[in-house]
């Protein structure tokens, strides 16, 4: 049952995200998820709800399975608050207050979710090789994404790569059997 609870939300969110991204050009600024959302508000809200749900479900399953800490709970509340801000405030530069609240929410969601996933893997770093690999992969993706964001600003690809990586890595650790070592 855990496998379905983990993978189904990730698959649904990933498919919806790919479909949603077809409204823009993924490698250009006008293909940013928030930019698409200016014209397609309802679709943007659905994307946000599916994304935060898939990530929260998988982060919760992983933390409960592999750690004893409950520190992820306030982090998920902060992350979800960021997503709510992202969805409630327009990405419209002419409406400065809304624009800045939207950007702050997006940053809070992205940073806190990325940190929460990274900390999960880091806490388990010494347990198994898969956690070592995923810790390094997560760090590289988050740092690389940050650098690309500074260089190219927001694009659909820059926004979705860390999210899709999270879907994949979290689903992998949540669905693996307890006795299997993937990189062993």
Give the positions of each predicted feature.
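Interfacial helix-start motif at the membrane-water boundary
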Residues: 35-55
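Membrane-proximal helix-loop-helix units in multi-pass membrane proteins
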Residues: 79-130
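Membrane-interfacial loop-to-transmembrane alpha-helix junctions, especially the N-terminal start
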Residues: 2-10, 67-79, 127-138
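Terminal transmembrane helical module of multi-pass membrane proteins
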Residues: 122-184
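Juxtamembrane "helix-exit" motif on the non-cytosolic side of transmembrane helices
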Residues: 21-25, 63, 88-96, 122-123, ...
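Non-cytosolic membrane-interface motifs at loop->transmembrane helix junctions
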Residues: 34, 95-108, 155-164
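Alpha-helical transmembrane segments of multi-pass membrane proteins
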Residues: 10-27
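Membrane-interface interhelical loops and short amphipathic "cap" helices
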Residues: 26-39, 95-97
């Amino acid at each position: 049952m855990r496998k379905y609870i983990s993978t189904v939300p990730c698959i649904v969110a990933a498919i919806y995200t790919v479909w949603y991204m077809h409204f823009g050009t993924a490698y250009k600024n006008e293909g940013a998820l928030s930019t698409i959302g200016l014209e397609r508000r309802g679709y943007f809200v659905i994307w946000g709800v599916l994304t935060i749900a898939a990530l929260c479900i998988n982060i919760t399953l992983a933390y409960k399975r592999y750690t004893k800490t409950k520190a992820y709970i306030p982090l998920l509340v902060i992350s979800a608050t960021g997503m709510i801000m992202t969805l409630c405030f327009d990405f419209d530069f002419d409406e400065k207050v809304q624009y800045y609240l939207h950007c702050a929410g997006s940053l809070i969601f992205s940073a806190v979710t990325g940190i929460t996933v990274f900390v999960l893997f880091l806490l388990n770093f010494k347990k198994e090789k898969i956690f070592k690999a995923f810790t390094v992969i997560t760090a590289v993706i988050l740092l690389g994404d940050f650098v690309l964001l500074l260089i190219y600003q927001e694009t659909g690809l820059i926004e979705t790569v860390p999210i899709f990586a999270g879907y994949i890595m979290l689903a992998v650790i949540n669905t693996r059997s307890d006795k299997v070592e993937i990189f062993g």
